[in-house]
Every structure is written in C-alpha cells, then in structure tokens.
Amino acid sequence: MAITRRSFLKGVATTSAASVIGPSLLASASANAVETTGTWKVSGSHWGAFRAHIYAGKVQEIKPIELDQNPTEMLNGIKGIIYSPSRVRYPMVRLDWLKKHKYSADTRGNNRFVRVTWDEALDLFYRELERVQKEYGPWALHAGQTGWNQTGSFNNCTAHMQRAVGMHGNYITKVGDYSTGAGQTILPYVLGSTEVYAQGTSWSEILENADNIILWANDPVKNLQVGWNCETHESYAYLAQLKEKVAKGEINVISVDPVKNKTQRYLENDHLYVNPMTDVPFMLAIAHVLYTENLYDKKFIETYCLGFEEFINYVQGKTKDKVEKTPEWAAPICGVKADKIREFARMLVKGRTQILMGWCIQRQEHGEQPYWAAAVVAAMIGQIGLPGGGISYGHHYSSIGVPSTGFAGPGGFPRNLDAGMKPKWDNNDFNGYSRTIPVARWIDCLLEPGKEINYNGGKVKLPDFKMMVISGCNPWHHHQDRNRMKQAFQKLQTVVTIDFAWTATCRFSDIVLPACTQWERNDIDVYGSYSSRGLIAMHRLVDPLFQSKPDFQIMKELTERFGRSEEYSRGMSEMDWIRSLYNDCKKSNEGKFEMPEFDEFWEKSVLDFGQGQPWVRHADFRQDPEINPLGTPSGFIEITSRKIGRYGYEHCQEHPMWFEKSERSHGGPGSDKHPFWLQSCHPDKRLHSQMCESEEFRATYAVKGREPVYINPLDAKAKGIKEGDLVRVFNDRGQLLAGAVLTDSYPRGVIRIEEGAWYGPLNEKVGAIDTYGDPNTLTQDIGSSELAQATSANTCIVDFEKFTGKVPPVTSFGGPIEVA
C-alpha cells in the first residue's frame, strides 16, 4: 500500500519516544529519511516488528511498529544486514576442493572460492550426498547443526534443509543446545522440567509481592532486546517499574555477578561481587548458614523435597571430603567475606525473595552444579510456588515473565518426512555409532571417532562422519577453540553451507549456497515469544539480492535431482504454505481469539490480542504436590538425585557439590600463567553473531575496527594500555586482537569480549591470530560433565598485552577471495 510519509507518521504517533535500552529509534530513523513518498511494509525480526520504507526497490528507513514501546537500537542494523558487503552473492565452491575434491582439506579456510552456476552447485551437492550414502552410509553425514536462524514460521531454514536431506537419506543429528546445555539437562532431575525455556512467574506478581530480587549472573536489560520469535519488548515496562521501586526502597535488588552489568547500572541496585566460576562454594556456604542458624523452611523441605539429609551432611563435612562448607571455607574461594555471606543468607529469608538466574553461569565446567545448588537454596528459603518467591531460570530471555495470552501460534514447515514416506537411501545402519550426539561434542567426533563417552545416563559412540550440511547457523561462532576446530575440519571431506552471510563457517566450507534474508521473502510469526501478544505478517520488503534464493526454493531444486520435489513441497508454493499455516492457526484458536480471513490479516499485518493473565510458576505443585507432581522420578524437588547417583559419574554426583575447575582465575589452577578470566557473554549489540556484518551499526561499538575488550583501568594501566589501544589477548589455545575499552564495571582480573564477534584468522594455519576478536579463539572445548557434555566456554583464563606489531587487516568481512 503506497502512502505518504505524513500519513505514516500520523499512524505511529502513539509510539513511545523513550526506551530503557537506548535512544528512541523514531528520532534517529527520521533523520535518515530521504523520500516523501513510497511504500511502507510491515515485517519482523528477532529484534522486533517494524515498518520499512521502500523506495526505488530498496529499504530506505526502518521504524518500530506502534505496539513496541521500548524498541531496541539494533533495528538500526537491519538495513546493514540486507546490504552487507558480507552477503553470499552467488553459489561458490572452494577452489582446491573443486580441483582436487576431498583431498584438499589442508587448505580449508584459505577463503579462495570459484563462482559457479546454481545448477553446477546443486549438482555437486547432490553428487556428494549420493557418494557419502553409497560409500559409507547415514553415519557419515552430519546435518544436525542448529542455531537461532531467522524469524518466521514457514521459512525455518534448518527444517527445510533437514526435510530435503532426510528425503535423500538418514543422517547424524544432535541433542541439546549451546545456550543452556547444562541447565536443560540437570534441571529435569531436580525440578522436573528444563525450566530454562519455561514460562515464569509474571513480572506483575514479582513486583507486587517480592521484597528481595536476586539477579544471579543475570542481565535482562541487555538480553531482552532480542527474542526467539518477533519480540515485543514488553518486559521493559516492568523493568522501569522495578527501577522506581528500587529508588523508593520498596524492593531490595542485588546483582550477584563478577561485573557490574547493564541491568545493575540501569536499576542502580546493589552489586555483590563473586569471583568467576565460584558461585557454588558461595551457595554451599549460604546453605550452611541457613541450616546451622535454623533459618531454613523445614516444613517446606519435608513436604516438597527429597534427599535433603544427604546434601546437608555434605555441607557439614560429614561425607568423604570431610570439609565443612562454612563461610570461612568459601570466602577465600569466592571472594566474598564470611560476614558478608552470613548477612546475605539471612537477608534471603527476610520477606519474600525471588531468585532470577542467568544462563552464563551454567556455560562452564561443571555447569550443572550452580543451577542445582541454586534450586536447593531456593528450596531452603521455602518460597517456591509463591508470588514473588522461588526461583526462575529464564526471566532474561524472550519476554519470559510477560503473561501469556494463551494464543496458539502457527505451526511450521515440517522438518521430518510425512507419514509413510521413506528416503531414497532407506538405510538405518549407523555402523555401531550413535545417530544422536550432544550438540557441543561434534568436534570430538572428528578428532576421536569411535570413542565412547558418557552422556545423561547412557553411552554415546562418536560417529566418524565425513560430510556436513549446515543451514542458517554459524558453528564457527558458537563452538569453542578455533584452532582445535581447524584441526578437526581437515578430517572432513565435504562441507556444504547454506546462508545469506559469508561467515567463518562459509570460509571453512566447500560448497556455499546463497540464501536470501528473511526480508526478501514472505512469512508469518508469533508476536511475542512468550507473551503471544499477537500475530504478524512478515512481508517481503525487496526481491532476493544477487543470485540468492529462499531456502524453500533451494531445497525444492535439490530434491528435484532425485525426484522428490513434489513430496518435499506437497505441491504448494510459499504463499500457499503461509496461507495454510494461518488457516490452521485460525482453526486451532477458534472460540478463543478472533482472527479474520487470511487476506484481511495479510493487509492488516498485525493482530493484537492484548495481554494475558498473571501466573505463578510452581503454584499448583505447592498447592498439592500429589495431584500436581513435578516431572522428577519422585514427583518432588530432588535435592539428592539417586538416579544421577547410580550413574557413577565423577564430575556430577548425587547432589550439588563444588568441583575445582581445570583452570580458574583469582588464585585458581593456571592463574599464575594466565591470571585473567575471560567472560564471553551474550552481546549487547548483536544476536550472537547475527548483525556483526552490519557495517554502519558495527561501527557504533567497534574500536579501531575490532571487537571491544572491556578491561579494568588498573589492569590496563599495569600493562601500559590506554583507551582505544589494540590489545593482543592470548592463552595456550590461541590469540586475538581487540580494541581496549576501560571501565570500572569490570573488577581486576576480569575482562570481557562478547561472543558473536566474527572470526577472522590471518590465514588458515593453526595458531594464526584472529584479526577481529572472536573470544572462542581462546575458549576451551570440554564438556561440562559426563551428565550434560555441554559447552564450558566460560571456564577460560587468558593474559593480554598492548599490541605493538604491524597491524593486520581485519579478514572477517567482505566475503570470499573469488578466483577466476
């Protein structure tokens, strides 16, 4: 619909001009307006819903929709994604792979590629699928990598790829994810569900009833800018109310964190420093105080919990380690004075206390333990299931805590084969290997094929796969230890990547296919990941750029090569699918939510169902644990898990325990050589690695063209480093360059480089310096424990120095080196 700029601005006049997460987008976007007429289209993203001004076939301007009262500044980066110099423009094949085929792995990563036609690229892709299934079998193909993808119900790129590849033959896949691998594995044993992705107690209930809120390694102001679906940013209104209550002294908020994070600075609440990776000793000492001073809720423990006696015997030093977990024992480990530990423990039981855990704390060696120990502390407080009390593991994620309307969102494109379908290569012989592996252990498969590892009560035999198909995700961002990955990728015969951006994953691939962005195709999506506020039409803004195509079209053309395209698509077009998903959604919500016919919805673009009713997590369990049991083996909170105990694991035993790390700062193992803890948390200006390629937006935070490294001024002074200097950060695993930002928000001995920075090695050789600042160049690739085998990225210590050599160019961006 073509409209004038004046009528559009009249339509958005109700949008808030202020945001707790940054300056208003309305002010900054209007300054960039270049035309007075044009077409305005609604679309969405992980960063929120917006209207885009289209003129002369290009996106000129982006504004948040009226419903978003707290838009993120990251909407300003969307144009930079669409028009990034790092777009995958054409089908590309790695030069040496094309010349020598699978025998060229030693040059993988040199970024030298040849442009080919779509037919040539898809023929090569299909040929490799055929070869691998014929020569080896399904165990030799890994097509299970996943990530955040882009938003949209129909255009889930992983679903499209896995359905198409699955129609050809079976393959290796994964279980778990990088975000919450340890947490989602341990918590079902303790609280009966993964908890990390569960709707939590409504913010309104917390604000009305809580006396104390503990933000434990939790930074919602930073992390709620993005959502799994199209985000509404409704949580920020509650955070603004919380700020007012903190200022008035109505709620006591304490951030337990090694750093003063963005939320703490916004709320201006108290900060309790804890040494990195030592939260468990702190929690054990809290439990000791609550028990020895008889402050814990004995009735709650007896009514709702099992296994308290075994745990408290450990805390009292009555088990095999013979160490009493007193505040005096914990203080030199965690860096909190014994008297402060006692004061904090006593505060927890004065009034209603809501503990809000973050995810960063479980992405470490023994990452299961802090989540388990925190649940035990919450149980001892005795307020689980009460408004404003208990524990949550998700209030920083995708608007968890905003009441859900109950609207059932649309389904998606089917990932699996339809009933009765069989793949072309109907072979289920995985040669004795496991067909499903823990997500963070896939590099182990390449370096130690055939090795048997423990995992969550079972055994996994690591498959010796030869080929990978990667769609819409960037494992060269989210996995750890880049130089180990380089060694592992030399074992692969073929890597096919389908993406719209030339990431490091493309650099280390053999065949790269150009997908279009989500703004070059149509879709629909839930508006509000957990609030389910409504439904949004995601209109195609511009035609696919260069030779890029929607994933649906790419995979349809692949399946044509073995006669399965009609089965793959069910004979439906993109808009047929979107209409069908909408109509199915309308039917499933009949009698609950009024939805117009599809054409009216598509023109209207946004359906708003308002807000849901407040809710309290675990309230039904507290009301009657026998009628409403938890999903644990006993139905109760399991402080001690006999099931885990029977596994006989060394690093995850039957109740929460303190395990020393393989490396730790502040006096821990290895700190004499590498004394600084590297925190690689979720970024403030990206969604993981998404938007790093957006040049103008990246320039708002990069330092001399590099990723920032945040350093305490005293640590910087000791090394002769000033604001803006280039810094070499290093350990025995790798080295990188980053730009120094000096700030008192970080204590001595702690530095931060946010994850998602694009890896840009100087060359393909093992040990080459990363020119931009990817922290996973330095992190270690070990499992959290035998239970979850999850990522341990935050068990990482480093050293740093001012860089004085010849400054290399950044190699992360701009696409491949095209060879004629």
From Swiss-Prot:
Annotated signal sequence is: 1-33
Enzyme class, UniProt record, top EC level:
oxidoreductase
PTM characteristics = Predicted to be exported by the Tat system. The position of the signal peptide cleavage has not been experimentally proven.
Q: Does the keyword NADP apply?
A: no
The answer to whether the entry has keyword ATP-binding is no
**What is an example of a GO molecular function annotated in this UniProt entry?**
molybdenum ion binding
| EC number in record | 1.7.2.3
Enumerate the catalysed reactions: trimethylamine + 2 Fe(III)-[cytochrome c] + H2O = trimethylamine N-oxide + 2 Fe(II)-[cytochrome c] + 3 H(+)
Where does this polypeptide localize? Periplasm
The main location is periplasm
* Co-factor note (free text): Binds 1 molybdenum-bis(molybdopterin guanine dinucleotide) (Mo-bis-MGD) cofactor per subunit.
Q: Keywords, A to Z? A: Metal-binding, Molybdenum, Oxidoreductase, Periplasm, Signal
- GO terms for biological process? anaerobic respiration
PROSITE patterns on file: MOLYBDOPTERIN_PROK_2, MOLYBDOPTERIN_PROK_3, TAT
Query: What domain of life does the UniProt record list for this protein's source?
Result: Bacteria
Name one matching Pfam family: Molydop_binding
The protein's required cofactors: Mo-bis(molybdopterin guanine dinucleotide)
Question: One GO term of the cellular component aspect?
Answer: outer membrane-bounded periplasmic space
Function according to Swiss-Prot or TrEMBL? Reduces trimethylamine-N-oxide (TMAO) into trimethylamine; an anaerobic reaction coupled to energy-yielding reactions.
Concerning its family, UniProt says:
Belongs to the prokaryotic molybdopterin-containing oxidoreductase family.
- The protein here is known as Trimethylamine-N-oxide reductase
Q: Which gene encodes it?
A: torA
